[in-house]
């Protein structure tokens, strides 16, 4: 340390066959939940002397594939994808990837996955809203193409309402993008109908 010597990362990579780099692909860098996830990833990687290369995709599945391909061709030891949805192109990449991939937030048989109980969360939310509501209930969600945050949460929400003797009536459901602005627009649409 006194001499200022720093070992060459390229020499270490040649010697150990490891880059000690993990590519992390996230849908939105400025999302609170994604910030927490990336902070947790960085903490664990740092404890193991790994570094993170971070790429944001602005909720665009095609960009997820683009960045995973970039990282696959860069000397990374693995990729972590916080996925928006798993498309046929995602499955193809995951089946053929030369580096290990972990998917967070979605389920696929082609990678190790860490995902939440979106159905259970939606159901708990449906029960809680039904217990406090005296009027009509509305739901704003993302596209059902997103099997986790879209389909599973909506199905769980509807089940929670049903268990509480309520239902989501026609016209009280809106599909939004995964942004606060889009959610706000859908609230205004509901209020103006």
State what each model feature region is.
Residues 59, 81-127, 131, 144-145:
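Flexible loop/hinge segments that line or gate small-molecule binding clefts
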Residues 27-36, 54-63, 114-124, 140-162, ...:
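Hinge/beta->alpha junction and helix N-cap segments in small-molecule ligand-binding domains
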Residues 5-78:
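Amphipathic helical "hinge" segments at domain boundaries
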């Amino acid at each position: 340390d006194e001499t200022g010597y720093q070992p060459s990362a390229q020499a270490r990579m040649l010697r150990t066959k490891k880059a000690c780099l993990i590519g992390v692909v996230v849908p939105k860098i400025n999302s609170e939940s994604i910030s927490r996830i990336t902070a947790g990833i960085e903490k664990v990687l740092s404890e193991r002397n790994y570094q993170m290369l971070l790429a944001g995709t602005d909720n665009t599945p095609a960009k997820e594939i683009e960045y995973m391909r970039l990282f696959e061709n860069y000397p990374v030891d693995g990729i972590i994808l916080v996925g928006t949805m798993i498309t046929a192109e995602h499955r193809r990449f995951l089946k053929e990837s030369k580096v290990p991939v972990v998917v967070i937030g979605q389920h696929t048989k082609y990678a190790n996955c860490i995902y939440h109980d979106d159905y259970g969360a939606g159901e708990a939310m449906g029960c809680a809203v039904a217990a406090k509501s005296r009027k009509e209930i509305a739901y704003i969600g993302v596209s059902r193409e997103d099997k986790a945050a879209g389909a599973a949460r909506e199905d769980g929400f509807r089940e929670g309402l049903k268990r509480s003797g309520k239902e989501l009536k026609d016209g009280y459901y809106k599909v939004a993008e995964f942004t606060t602005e889009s959610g706000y627009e859908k609230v205004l649409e509901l209020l103006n109908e």
